[in-house]
Amino acid sequence: SDEGEGLWRRFPHLQLDGNLYPTHGLGPVANCLDINRGDRFEYLVSMSSLEAGLTEYRDEHVAPSDPKRQERYRTGDMNTSLIKTALGRTIMLQHDVVSPRPYSRINLISGTRGTFADYPPRIMLEGQPEGDAWAGLDAYKSEFESPLWTRVGELARKLGGHGGMDFIMNYRMVQCLREGLETLWHRRIGGA
């Protein structure tokens, strides 16, 4: 498409190879690992598969006379980045907007006493009644629910996109600015 999402998604695929959109996958994991609050990224290696999916889609859906048929995509269908932190933790970050598959954020946090996976959210903790099977989060929400979500979660679900995530992020930014608190954005640029 030459309008809307078609342009901003297509042009980077023509010019770049790598993870074109790392924030959704890396942001939540970096927050859980206290990146820039006790740990930091130290080493990264990244590689992409070959590009095939967009070319195949274009060849099946774009008229032979359309100038877009001459475009050559550079971004591989799947990019995988491995990141090592100063404390020895590892992160695997993947980006794939081409392959046919159900939506998943593929977030997984694994430690010595359990594992959390997201989308759909599920958890397995050492010694839990379910044994070595995934369990839902409902049993843990009352004890570990974010005070911010408790306060504005219903409003966020009603007014915000992505299940309330967009609203919560904007609400938290405004709260930090009003109260003079440090935001993640300030941390990234070294203060304001």
Q: What is the meaning of each model-derived region?
A:
Residues 30, 100-192:
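C-terminal helical cap and adjacent loop that interface with cofactors, partners, or active-site loops
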Residues 33, 85, 95-97, 177:
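Short beta-strand segments enriched in hydrophobic/aromatic residues
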Residues 90-92, 115:
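Short, mixed charged/polar active-site loops
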Residues 14-22, 37, 72-74, 159-166, ...:
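Aromatic-acidic/polar surface patches that form glycan- and anion
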Residues 1, 47-53, 87, 97-100, ...:
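Glycine-rich beta-alpha junction loops
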Residues 76, 81-87, 111:
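Active-site beta-strand termini and strand-to-loop segments that position acidic
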Residues 1-72, 173:
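Predominantly a Rossmann-like dinucleotide-binding segment in NAD(P)-dependent oxidoreductases
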Residues 75, 93-103:
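Glycine-rich phosphate/pyrophosphate-binding beta-alpha loops
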